[in-house]
């Protein structure tokens, strides 16, 4: 067996494959958001603000 570090090993070696997977994932996931683009946009904003937790000082 070839040595791979963790689950993302294949993507680390093949960025194009990772990019494809990201695109496909984005298209197929979030079924609820397809019907409500505004809700998806709000969720994206909230997610961006809250990730990283301590940076905003609001926890």
UniProtKB/Swiss-Prot annotation:
This protein's source sits in the domain of life called: Bacteria
Query: Which InterPro entries does its entry note?
Result: Stress-induced_KGG_rpt (IPR019626)
Q: Where is this region: Disordered?
A: 1-59
* Bias kind Gly residues: ranges: 46-59
Amino acid composition bias (Basic and acidic residues), ranges on this chain: 1-23, 36-45
User: What's an example Gene Ontology biological process for this entry?
Assistant: bacterial-type flagellum-dependent swarming motility
Write out the coiled-coil annotation as residue ranges.
none
Q: Which family does it belong to?
A: Belongs to the con-10 family.
| Name used for this protein in its record | Uncharacterized protein YciG
Q: Which organism is it from?
A: Escherichia coli (strain K12)
């Amino acid at each position: 067996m070839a040595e791979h570090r963790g689950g993302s090993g294949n993507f680390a070696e093949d960025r194009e494959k990772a990019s494809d997977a990201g695109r496909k994932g984005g298209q197929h996931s979030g079924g609820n958001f397809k019907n409500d683009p505004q809700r998806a946009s709000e969720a994206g904003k909230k997610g961006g603000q809250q990730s990283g937790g301590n940076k905003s000082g609001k926890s």
